[in-house]
């Protein structure tokens, strides 16, 4: 123990004696450890521990896969259907849910509250207890009866609205002028649905009232086995309401982990590979620095060996110094990771991670960082220690100077490390360039509509208000008209479900006179005539509806060019008739105009627009008047002369003029909405972080190259002096230095190009542009070669300025 303490003190003294060496080594490690720890923090939160619910991988969504392979068809269940599903041998539980926005009416200012109406078997389904009070219980929603007016708060809403009042249980909260008793507060990580409150759901046996199910399969049952058992049950449900189900569907049961956590996994693993490369470059730097530093200490080590120090004793001393560097590096790295986490989280795509996931520097992440430090200590410290612990005692003791020449083996080892650094750096630069090009292409993509200066204002209708079809149609139109009349508003239109970048309701359609058995599918969009003007979607052929046709719910349709080309060879669909079977009147939730289930004549064709993401192929689309099928919700699209959200207060004021109690849900700037999409956000995240990591890698590689060349110059000083004494010129010495470096850099570039080709095959999911682009590879290679030349210039000049007489005296 005493000898270990002595080693630690000696190591600290040695590191303090060389602050430049110590700082460079520590920073090289800290950057790699910090970046790796930050990425691992996100991986741990999103992929390892995304949900606090026991058996989260057994909680599944009920989806249907259509003939095209799309699984974006969701199944709604009535109470009786849920009961049938619970009887399946593979099913442990089924919880029914619905989402709605309410308004608090017990304070000075109303506040929008996101509510999750949930069946009272939720405690068993999610397997979590309330933090305070209780969860919902069966008596809160007796079958066939109206639910009790009770509410359970999320931890976040309790903190925000009630400031964490510990005496909240038993108090009441007014929601849309109805008192609800607060019976519980959930733990901080219980955030299912990302809502504010949980209210008991009224479950009825009415087959027309369907809500979203969450299915929990039994332990030991695979998702495939459960899906196979549920397939005939869901097929029976489909016979009752064929219009709600795609043809020839297959049941799919993705877990909530599959749906909400794992999609980001490949991107995170790609970034982990990038930071691992950065760590390898940093570790190679430290190995180079330790070898160079050790070469200066060969005389000291020879003296130690001569007076009896064993090899293991010297290895332990050298590893202790490496451990000191690693310890300091991990402390600084954790601090860098802590600060860098904010940057990563801020640039994660919106809704790309579960609300329950907590990204922070927790104990597992700290243990990972410590383990990483230990591994890197062995990785970068052991090999130099083994090399330096075998000094040539006789030769070194006979030398009259402490300056020694480096061995050919040491120079080759350094060269191999430099080549590896160059290869990894070129790979990262190429990946960063490809990711950057892909992101720029995405930014400049032609969407077919103009999202700039436009916002979406969601308007929900409270239960038992505007129930009649005519009243609801006039109410929505009145709000739109008041907003459109504002001085700073260019235009306003209504979009029930057609707001890009993700819009439409995928439905099979019938074509009058068609003899084909298979029905084509199209996106059904409910809009008014102003919708196209707001989004700058041009009319290509025919006409749009007039105001009277809109307010009457006249069954007339407008289609996009893709649908016209696919269904009619000459692209002219004007005058043809189509039918949508899914339009059913279900008061008070859905109000449908008379005749909406009849044949609809096509009166116009509009240009294509990407209203389902940014990269997917444009799908057939059918636009019908919003009054044909109205929900308890609509959106007003508003194009403005100024920044859209700057008018939000004035827009709310106009809405209040129509109905003082009308709430407004989350208002979105369409352009910002696009930038929050997963495909946009992931591409931006990869491009940004690869750019940062590649710059750091380039800097570390330059430091490593500088260190190697400096080491080579120091160990070959005598050789250079002799050459110059024999007549060599400055250019000859520079050529010697640069030629040796060129061999290492050239080998690294060749290896880097091969790695880039391999990377191109593996990373097509995240990097849409090819990393084999000759222009990109040439540009990256030139950048790397120029950086290498600059890193070599100073030590090369030092070699060329060696005084021959001084060098000869040292020999």
Q: What is each model feature region?
A:
Residues 48-101, 209-214, 442, 446-507:
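Membrane-proximal extracellular/periplasmic loop immediately following the first transmembrane helix
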Residues 18-46, 50, 281-284, 326-331, ...:
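Short, strongly hydrophobic transmembrane alpha-helices
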Residues 31-64, 291, 340-350, 424-453, ...:
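Alpha-helical transmembrane segments
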Residues 1-22, 256-261, 290-316, 320, ...:
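Alpha-helical transmembrane segments of integral membrane proteins
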Residues 101, 115-140, 147-269, 342-343, ...:
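Mid-to-C-terminal secondary-structure elements
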Residues 282-326, 404, 703-742, 802-803, ...:
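Interfacial "coupling" helices/loops that link adjacent transmembrane helices in transporter permeases
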Residues 39-42, 287, 323-396, 434-437, ...:
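Small-residue-rich transmembrane alpha-helices
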Residues 1-24, 53-54, 68, 109, ...:
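Membrane-helix entry/capping segments
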């Amino acid at each position: 123990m005493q000898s270990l303490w002595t080693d630690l003190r000696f190591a600290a003294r040695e590191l303090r004696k060389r602050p430049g060496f110590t700082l460079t080594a520590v920073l090289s490690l800290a950057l790699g450890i910090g970046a790796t720890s930050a990425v691992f923090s996100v991986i741990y939160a999103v992929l390892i521990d995304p949900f606090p619910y026991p058996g989260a991988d057994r909680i599944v969504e009920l989806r249907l896969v259509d003939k095209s392979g799309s699984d974006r068809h969701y199944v709604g269940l009535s109470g009786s259907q849920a009961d049938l599903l619970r009887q399946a041998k593979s099913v442990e539980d089924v919880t029914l849910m619905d989402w709605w926005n309410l308004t608090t009416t017990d304070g000075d200012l109303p506040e929008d509250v996101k509510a999750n109406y949930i069946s009272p078997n939720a405690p068993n389904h999610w397997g979590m207890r309330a933090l305070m009070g209780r969860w919902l219980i069966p008596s809160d929603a007796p079958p066939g009866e109206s639910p009790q007016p009770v509410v359970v708060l999320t931890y976040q809403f309790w903190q925000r609205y009630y400031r964490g009042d510990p005496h909240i249980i038993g108090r009441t909260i007014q929601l849309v002028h109805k008192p609800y008793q607060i019976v519980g507060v959930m733990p901080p990580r219980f955030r299912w649905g990302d809502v504010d409150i949980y209210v008991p759901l009224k479950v009825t046996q009415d087959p027309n009232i369907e809500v979203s199910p969450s299915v929990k399969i039994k332990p030991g049952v695979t998702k495939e086995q459960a899906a196979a058992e549920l397939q005939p049950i869901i097929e029976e449900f489909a016979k009752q309401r064929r219009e709600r189900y795609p043809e020839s569907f297959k049941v799919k049961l993705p877990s909530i982990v599959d749906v909400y956590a794992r999609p980001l996994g490949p991107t995170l693993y790609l970034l982990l590979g990038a930071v691992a490369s950065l760590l390898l470059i940093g570790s190679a730097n430290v190995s180079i620095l330790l070898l160079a530093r050790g070469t200066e200490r060969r005389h000291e080590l020879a003296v130690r060996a001569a007076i009896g120090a064993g090899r293991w004793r010297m290895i332990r001393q050298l590893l202790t110094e490496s451990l000191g560097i690693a310890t300091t590096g991990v402390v600084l790295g954790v601090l860098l990771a802590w600060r860098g986490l904010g940057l990563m989280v801020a640039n994660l795509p919106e809704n790309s991670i579960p609300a329950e996931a907590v990204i922070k520097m927790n104990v597992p992440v700290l243990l990972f960082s410590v383990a990483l430090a230990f591994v890197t200590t062995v990785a970068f410290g052991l090999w130099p220690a083994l090399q330096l612990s075998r000094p040539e005692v006789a030769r070194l003791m006979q030398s009259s100077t402490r300056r020694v020449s480096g061995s050919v083996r040491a120079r080759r080892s350094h060269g191999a490390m430099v080549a590896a650094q160059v290869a990894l750096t070129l790979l990262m630069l190429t990946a960063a360039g490809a990711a950057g090009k892909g992101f720029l292409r995405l930014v400049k993509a032609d969407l077919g509509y103009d999202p700039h200066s436009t916002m979406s204002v969601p308007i929900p209708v409270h239960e038992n208000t505007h129930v009649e079809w005519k009243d609801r149609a006039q109410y929505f139109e009145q709000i739109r008209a008041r907003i459109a009349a504002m001085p700073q508003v260019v235009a306003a239109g209504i979009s029930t479900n057609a707001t890009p970048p993700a819009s439409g309701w995928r439905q099979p359609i019938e074509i009058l006179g068609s003899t084909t058995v298979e029905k084509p599918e199209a996106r059904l969009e409910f809009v008014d005539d102003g919708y196209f003007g707001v989004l700058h979607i041009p009319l290509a052929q025919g006409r749009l509806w007039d105001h009277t046709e809109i307010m009457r719910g006249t069954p007339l349709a407008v289609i996009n060019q893709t649908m016209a080309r696919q269904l009619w060879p000459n692209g002219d669909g004007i005058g043809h008739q189509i039918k949508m079977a899914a339009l059913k009147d279900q008061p008070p939730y859905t109000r449908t105009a008379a005749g909406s289930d009849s044949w609809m004549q096509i009166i116009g064709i509009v240009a294509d627009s990407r209203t389902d993401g940014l990269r997917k192929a444009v799908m057939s689309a059918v636009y019908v008047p919003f009054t044909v099928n109205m929900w308890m919700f609509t959106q007003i699209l508003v194009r403005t002369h100024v920044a859209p959200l700057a008018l939000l207060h004035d827009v709310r004021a106009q809405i209040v003029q129509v109905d003082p109690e009308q709430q407004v849900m989350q208002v979105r700037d369409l352009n910002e909405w696009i930038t929050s999409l997963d495909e946009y956000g992931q591409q931006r995240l990869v491009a940004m972080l690869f750019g940062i990591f590649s710059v750091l890698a380039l800097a570390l590689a330059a430091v490593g190259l500088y260190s190697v060349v400096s080491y080579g110059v120091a160990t070959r000083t005598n050789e250079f002096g002799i050459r110059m004494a024999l007549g060599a010129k400055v250019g000859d010495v520079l050529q010697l230095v640069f030629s040796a470096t060129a061999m290492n850099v050239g080998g690294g570039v060749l290896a880097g190009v091969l790695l880039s080709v391999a990377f191109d095959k593996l990373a097509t999911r995240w990097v849409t542009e090819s990393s084999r682009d000759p222009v990109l590879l040439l540009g990256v290679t030139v950048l790397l070669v120029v950086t290498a030349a600059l890193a070599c210039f100073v030590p090369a000049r030092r070699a060329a300025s060696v005084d021959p007489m001084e060098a000869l005296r040292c020999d």
